[in-house]
Amino acid sequence: WVYDPATSHVSRKTILKKPVFWGIWIAFYINITCGLALISQEKDILHDVLRAFPQYANLSPAKFAAAISGIIGLVLAVDSVFNTAGRVGFSTLSDHLKRRETVYQVIFIMSIAVCLLQIFTNSIGNALLWAVLAMLFLVNAGYGGGFSTLPVLLDQHFGTKTVSTTHGLTLSAWAFAGLSGNQLASFVVAHAPDQAHRYAALIPVLTGLFVVALISISLVKYLGDRN
């Protein structure tokens, strides 16, 4: 195979005019935004949950911070494992599926489910560590998986010759998510009506965003099936 600039050229304007591109862009942007929003508050969420444990109730702030530092460090390390596993696992799953959008649907449904679990159990307020960890680990897995499966999704809709261009354009969503994810979380936490449960207020917002992402990627799949 020899690279031919004439036949391999793709117009960026043409790509940007396609609804399918924007459906993918929105879904990718939301997945990264939610992942960054949760990661940015992860230590504080764990801090609040662990503070409710009886063995830590009477400790001074300094002793409490020292006592839980190892636990938080371990959780962050396991987070990285789930992020890596999500990248490998979801990309492997996508190789066995006819429609690549299905992987994103699985990621978003999984993320919605674990967020709803927090809402219905009030896991942060009730110090249900297992439920909080399930949310942190699975959302992190989806965060990594959404990134690793993006190229094959773009290949499916725009062709192999355009992957570099479409991938570059879609990665602009990562840049915007980097600007908005942490700020979104900080805004929601700072303006929560009940400051005693300020971190729990973030979860319904993430749930709503994941629903929008699921709708967006489902529309992409619908348009792809029509074509």
Regions found by a protein language model. Name each.
Residues 34, 70-83, 88-153:
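C-terminal transmembrane helical hairpin of 12-TM major facilitator-type secondary transporters
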Residues 13-91, 151, 178-185:
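Extracytoplasmic gate region of multi-pass secondary transporters
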Residues 55-76, 100, 128, 132, ...:
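Juxtamembrane helix-start elements in MFS-like secondary transporters
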Residues 187-209:
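A membrane-interface helix-boundary motif in multi-pass transporters
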